[in-house]
């Protein structure tokens, strides 16, 4: 009796461990319609209204690496506060990380398959919108870079070496592209800041020039009034 119970326990443990090792793939939907997962990389700019929040969803497998970069390029309105709050959540809704700054990055490994949520909140600005540039996505390392392939074909040593070199080059180019996008964020933000300072200096210089000209006209007017002597006649003489 005891050996049978022992064997049954081993079978149950094996089933549980195999179930845990499987990927948490989402449901494909009703019928034969496949689930739309979108692209793996995205970069674009978005305008968030005062006190507003914008959220995005990115699909990722549990063996990937997620990256998220943002840069507040400029403010549109009465306020000049460029700080925003960025958050990342798991497919189950749990908070992964929060970033509250003008620019920032959120990077993490994906431990479950599903749609990860990214949110940007402009809660500190009640009277100004912010333009934010985003760059986020997911990439995979190793043999699981292409999840559409069920199994890889066996190649000879020469083709394997070429494939490995190509994969490394592709991996390095991808990370160069990431750093280039982050540098482009900074460049665009600096351009908007330079343009804002240029307009500020021009308007301030124009205002100061008008004040100087107006003060000169007023001084000339009062000086003329000070030295202006009225014409006197025999009947109209100034009294002592």
From Swiss-Prot:
Membrane-side (Cytoplasmic) residue stretches: 224-240
Transmembrane domains' residue ranges: 201-223
Keyword Ribosomal protein among UniProt keywords: no
Keywords of this entry: Endoplasmic reticulum, Glycoprotein, Membrane, Signal, Transmembrane, Transmembrane helix
Any GO BP annotation: Golgi organization
Glycan-bearing residues: 107, 156
Lumenal face residues: 22-200
Topology term for the membrane: Single-pass type I membrane protein
Extent of the signal sequence: 1-21
Locations listed in the record: Endoplasmic reticulum membrane
Residue ranges of every copy of the GOLD domain listed in the record: 53-138
SMART domains noted in UniProt: EMP24_GP25L (SM01190)
GO CC aspect terms: COPII-coated ER to Golgi transport vesicle; endoplasmic reticulum; endoplasmic reticulum membrane; endoplasmic reticulum-Golgi intermediate compartment; Golgi apparatus
Keyword GTP-binding assigned: no
Lineage: superkingdom: Eukaryota
Family affiliation: Belongs to the EMP24/GP25L family.
Protein name from the UniProt record: Transmembrane emp24 domain-containing protein 6
Species the sequence originates in: Bos taurus
């Amino acid at each position: 009796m005891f050996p049978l119970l022992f064997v049954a326990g081993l079978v149950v443990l094996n089933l549980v461990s195999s179930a845990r090792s499987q990927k948490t793939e989402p449901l494909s939907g009703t019928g034969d319609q496949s689930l739309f997962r979108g692209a793996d990389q995205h970069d674009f700019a978005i305008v968030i209204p005062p006190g507003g929040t914008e959220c995005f969803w990115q699909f990722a497998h549990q063996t990937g690496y997620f990256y998220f970069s943002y840069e507040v390029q400029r403010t549109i309105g009465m306020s000049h506060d460029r700080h925003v709050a960025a958050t990342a959540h798991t497919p189950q809704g749990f908070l992964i990380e929060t970033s509250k700054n003008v620019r920032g990055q959120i990077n993490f490994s994906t431990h479950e398959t599903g749609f990860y949520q990214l949110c940007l909140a402009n809660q500190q600005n009640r009277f100004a919108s912010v333009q934010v540039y985003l760059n986020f996505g997911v990439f995979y390392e190793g043999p699981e870079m292409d999840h559409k392939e069920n199994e890889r074909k066996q190649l000879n040593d020469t083709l394997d070496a070429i494939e490995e070199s190509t994969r490394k080059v592709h991996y390095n180019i991808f990370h160069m592209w990431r750093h280039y996008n982050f540098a482009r964020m900074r460049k665009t933000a600096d351009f908007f800041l330079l343009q804002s300072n240029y307009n500020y200096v021009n308007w301030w210089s124009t205002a100061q020039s008008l004040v100087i000209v107006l003060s000169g006209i007023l001084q000339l007017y009062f000086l003329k009034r000070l030295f202006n002597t009225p014409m006197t006649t025999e009947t109209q003489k100034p009294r002592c």
